[in-house]
């Protein structure tokens, strides 16, 4: 079992055997590379030396790794059998051995060797005598070939420095697909030399040049990461239609959208000029991205503009296309032919495969196991389906011979707790914890198949399971800025990376959180701003450098989960994303540890643990007066004051009930009712933030005090 010995590694390797033969680090540490390797390995080995120097404070003579094989005294010997190619099913396996005399990394390709270097950096430990690599033998390879992260550009543009530090973090946790979401209703974000009007009119001034795109691809390739572009078609196309309104299905004035949601503007799929335009544009974009896969979107087409266009309706009747889904399939096939000429395989959201039907009919087919009834059978098999709406799309894809990747349950922009993502497995048999998302209606119905999965039954055959090639976390940027995006990405995405890399039996949530706290700090060392920006933003919010008392509140609240912020409909592209909700971190470590304390107290209400609880409650009680004074002249602290008030009230009442228990007295029914009412009131969100700890606090206090 990979988790039999406790390590700090994330993701957990396939096989780990620790030993006490630690390798002591000195200034003389050097690296030797042998075998066949691309230049990327030499660059990454040099970067490894720099990071190791920064981590240990050691003064190495050089960070550069010469492209020569002679260096018999090298401490780290890396051997690569072949030069790797960054593509689907790239060879990423490696073995790593550390003893007191040397370190060896042997890999099938230089990409595997790079994965081994990341593991080795996580083995650095220290004691009073200095730094060392933990003695170990590791054999490792990924469980899934597709381990991705989507980053959308049109909503809030993320500049080059954000992309590069995101790629650095992805490489650290062994993710290997960067999904570059280029276009939507809010913008088209790369330069077009064949249609310069596109980036001139439809980017809002925010776009990457061809040179910058090449820089991103090279940066990713060095780290063993594929870059896959997405141009969302035929819906989500307001930006394209702003530049080229003659391609639209409906005559109207088109301007870039600055709100969030699903809109009607749709490309006209019935006119040949559309395909002339898309042939030229997609061929240009395809030439920029060397990966064999190209994402065409295909999601959330309302069909409204098609329904209103008499010419489109006449075309559908002539071609025997019964509905908007059939027309979109016609469009997709035309796009597929265009991209095939560029040697591309299309990827699309699950709408490109699934039939449109009411929930009752879908439930009937799903419960009967007639999954072929859920899909459009005329869709070519050589596509990849990205499942975002529910497990039925994933199952139907695999059952009918389509490759698929899972994103449902990996929407990190919805700020769900880390365990929610961690326990969400791409293989349905293992997806025993299927968490319905009531905001998104991802699970549209309960069924016997869902119950079978939750009971651990296999729904797919081994061959069908192989068609599920991985998963992809999605970072939709409606409610983030370059300043806040890291706090939404990290460290939670590291847990998704582990789910996609590590063996299926690695599911210990407590141990995941233990290691996540460690990896979080290491991600900051690498350049992630998820920790330091939170403090900077809180200082700005408070207009002072003294933020300790504010942190005592902010560290225990969370942004509202799911689509609650989207549904408020008062945020746009130009709204401030520097408010309390933007400062608050998803699944904060302090809140988790407080809840863990309460869980432990229910089992073992020892004096030591009770004292810890008292200290925290006293802190919130006494903290409030200071915050009240700070908020008096600062309206930006209004929502924080609301949460501080809740904490002060429930803390003081909790102390009262605990003191009664200490005196051997019982709380009256009226006191219990008042306490419950206060807890309930504290759960009401303020400033799009929620204070959820009251539920666990109430559970312990009432359980303990009524015994």
Regions found by a protein language model. Give the residues of each.
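Feature activates predominantly on carbohydrate-active enzymes
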Residues: 83-295, 309, 334, 338, ...
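Conserved alpha/beta catalytic core and glycan-binding cleft of carbohydrate-active enzymes
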Residues: 354-357, 364-381, 386-529, 602-608, ...
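C-terminal functional modules
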Residues: 89-94, 469-487, 491-707
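Contiguous, structured surface segment used for ligand recognition
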Residues: 4-144, 496-509, 514-527
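Active-site-proximal loop/turn and secondary-structure-junction residues that shape catalytic pockets
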Residues: 184-186, 194, 231-237, 300-302, ...
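Active-site neighborhood of glycoside hydrolase catalytic domains
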Residues: 263-384, 388-396
